[in-house]
Each structure stands twice: as structure tokens, then as C-alpha cells.
Regions:
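Intrinsic disorder/low-complexity segments enriched in small, polar and charged residues
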Residues: 4-5, 11
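Conserved N-terminal beta-strand and adjoining loop/helix that marks the start
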Residues: 14-45
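A generic fold-level signal
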Residues: 26-28, 40, 54, 106-109, ...
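Active-site segment of metal-dependent pyrophosphate-handling enzymes
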Residues: 27, 85-122
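Short, well-ordered beta-strand micro-motif
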Residues: 35-37, 49, 113-117, 137
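Conserved Nudix-box catalytic region and its N-terminal flanking loop in Nudix hydrolases
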Residues: 42-82
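Nudix hydrolase/Nudix homology domain
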Residues: 54-56, 127-176
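Short aromatic/basic micro-patch
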Residues: 60, 108, 135
Length: 176
């Protein structure tokens, strides 16, 4: 290595790169959950209308923060229970991540996506975060989704969780 060249055998010294470029943090502080219910041989997606200030009156799927000491899948089960009152669900990791950039705080938010299958008899009881809910087809959910990118996640879930059985390796055996 030549003194001051910033390379070792042609590879940039990462310390020097970090001193010359701005790093934007990536935060994984929450989870996203897509609940599926079969109706007449077709899966429907639970979409919730937001009542809070953020994304007010927009349709979204379940999501929320991960509490201190909690695993992501535990947060997913808790958010399902808190936002919908649903207590019986077969949960899977979607092996996907929801992500967006926050210009106000200059960071990238990322959240693991989970998929839950619920029995058609499970009632939905909304909490204060939502004003309405609908079980939508995948096309309806994509059309009504609040943010760009959600359609890609819904396409993935439809392909790998609705049109065929999910991989047994993605099953999560936790309890609500």
C-alpha cells in the first residue's frame, strides 16, 4: 500500500470511503403483515383504512413497530392481535422486505414482511388506528394500496402464498 493512496492491493480502504461519502442509515424497526383468507377458492387480502394522521384514510396492510426485546415475528403476531383482534393465524416469513426512504429524517426504513393465513370465520375487530377494513382481491388491494412498492410485495405474496402452498421452511410456529 502506498502511503495516502487509500487502497490495499487495489481495494479501497472502507474507512477512507466512509470519510468521503455520506452514509444514509437503514433502520429495521417494524414489521409488515399481509393476512390472507380464502373465499370461494380465491385468497383475499385484509386491507385496513388508516385513521391516524400518517396516511389518513389510506388503505394499508397491518404494520407496526418492534418493541424492545421482541423478535420481528413476535411483533407481527402482536400487531395482528392489536390491530384486528385476530388470535388464530398460521404465520410465515414472506422472505421479503418492505422499504421506503424518509426524506424528512434522511433514512431508509425496512421491515420484514410476514404472511398470515386466517380461517374465514375469524372476526375482525379494529382498534383506534383504523376506521374500516375490507377483504380485497389481490387486484383490488394493489389498486387501493397507499404507497408505491406495495403492489410488488402483493404480487410476490400472491405468487408464492396464494397461488401455491408456501415453503414449509418459512413457517413460524409462534403463538399469539
Amino acid at each position: 500500500m502506498k502511503r495516502g493512496s487509500g487502497t490495499v492491493d487495489g481495494v479501497k480502504d472502507t474507512k477512507q470511503v466512509n470519510q468521503t461519502k455520506q452514509v444514509i442509515p437503514i433502520r429495521c424497526e417494524g414489521v409488515a403483515v399481509i393476512l390472507l383468507k380464502k373465499n370461494l377458492d380465491q385468497y383475499h387480502v385484509l386491507m385496513l383504512k388508516r385513521a391516524s394522521r400518517m396516511l389518513h384514510n389510506e388503505w394499508c396492510y397491518i404494520g407496526g413497530g418492534i418493541e424492545m426485546g421482541e423478535k420481528a415475528w413476535e411483533a407481527a403476531l402482536r400487531e395482528i392481535r392489536e390491530e384486528t383482534g385476530i388470535t388464530e393465524v398460521r404465520l410465515y416469513s414472506a422472505n421479503q422486505f418492505e422499504q421506503y426512504y424518509s426524506p424528512m429524517e434522511d433514512y431508509t426504513y425496512t421491515a420484514p414482511v410476514f404472511v398470515g393465513y386466517v380461517d374465514e370465520s375469524q372476526p375482525v375487530q379494529l382498534n383506534h388506528e383504523h376506521s374500516d377494513y375490507q377483504w380485497m382481491t389481490f387486484d383490488e388491494a394493489k389498486e387501493n394500496a397507499a404507497l408505491p412498492g406495495i403492489d410488488h410485495i402483493l404480487d410476490f405474496v400472491e405468487k408464492h402464498f396464494a397461488k401455491k402452498a408456501p415453503s414449509k421452511w418459512l413457517r413460524i410456529d409462534g403463538k399469539i
